[in-house]
Amino acid sequence: LTAKLGYPITDELDIYTRLGGMVWRADSKYNIPGGASFKDHDTGVSPVFAGGLEWAVTRDIATRLEYQWTNNIGDANTVGTRPDNGLLSVGVSYRFGQQEAAAPVVAPAPAPAPEVQTKHFTLKSDVLFNFNKATLKPEGQQALDQMYTQLSNLDPKDGSVVVLGFTDRIGSDAYNQGLSEKRAQSVVDYLISKGIPSDKISARGMGESNPVTGNTCDNVKPRAALIDCLAPDRRVEIEVKGI
């Protein structure tokens, strides 16, 4: 009975050693001149040492070259000798029950990150408010009712709505900033009253920044004509961000 310890040199070639013991029985018979004969036997355990190489020809079949040494077999006092035994052997082994290695499980590719979409809507302030005012007109409320229907149809998941108020350049910067904030807040308050959650919508006043008329009204001098020319700058923009 031996224990085998192996170490892989390559994927196919192992070096190994076996250590253990062998139970033996030795029988002896000898004759004495004159016709008498005697028989005797002995049993015991001797240490076994072995070492070798094993090469995997296939998944199931392997060959090996081994040298085994057994020390002190028998008892010299009982059977008259106590030899050692050395054995050089070449063998072939077949391994039952070997199975193909399972194919590696490939994790599915992660789902692409959801695309964040932003929708932009622009409403004319002259439709929503009277000039220089921040209170919604009836026709302005009707325009926002239509806008609310569009926002509801979008139904953004985890989305948000930002209302941006803009004025024209008539008046001081501070006045126009305040007016734009009030107009944006008026639109927010109305949309909240229609059903948009208050934590999903916010107001931001942009003052007279980002005019869309550019320099087209620079040569317009009469005030009434200038107010009409700068009408596109007076607007409310609504940004809807969602997935």
UniProtKB/Swiss-Prot annotation:
Which Pfam family is an annotated match for this chain, by its short name? OmpA
Where does it mainly reside? membrane
Here the disulfide bonds are 217-229
User: What InterPro entries is this protein classified in?
Assistant: Bact_OuterMem_StrucFunc (IPR050330), OMP/PagP_b-brl (IPR011250), OMP_bac (IPR006664), OmpA (IPR002368), OmpA-like (IPR006665), OMPA-like_CS (IPR006690), OmpA-like_sf (IPR036737), OmpA-like_TM_dom (IPR000498)
Q: Where are the sequence repeats?
A: 107-108, 109-110, 111-112, 113-114
Task: Give positions of region: 4 X 2 AA tandem repeats of A-P.
Answer: 107-114
Q: Which GO terms describe its molecular function?
A: porin activity
**For the site Part of salt bridge gating mechanism, which positions are given?**
64
Q: Which domain of life is it from?
A: Bacteria
Membrane-topology annotation of the record:
Multi-pass membrane protein
Gene Ontology CC terms: cell outer membrane; pore complex
Q: Which CDD domains match?
A: OmpA_C-like
Record keywords: Cell outer membrane, Disulfide bond, Ion transport, Membrane, Porin, Repeat, Transmembrane, Transmembrane beta strand, Transport
Q: Which residues form the OmpA-like domain?
A: 116-243
| Annotated domain remarks | The extracellular loops are most variable in sequence, and in some bacteria confer sensitivity to phage and/or colicins.
Q: Which family does it belong to?
A: Belongs to the outer membrane OOP (TC 1.B.6) superfamily. OmpA family.
Q: How does it assemble?
A: Monomer and homodimer.
User: What exactly does this protein do?
Assistant: With TolR probably plays a role in maintaining the position of the peptidoglycan cell wall in the periplasm. Acts as a porin with low permeability that allows slow penetration of small solutes; an internal gate slows down solute passage.
What is the name of the protein in this document? Outer membrane protein A
- Species, as recorded: Atlantibacter hermannii (Escherichia hermannii)
**Gene coding for it:** ompA
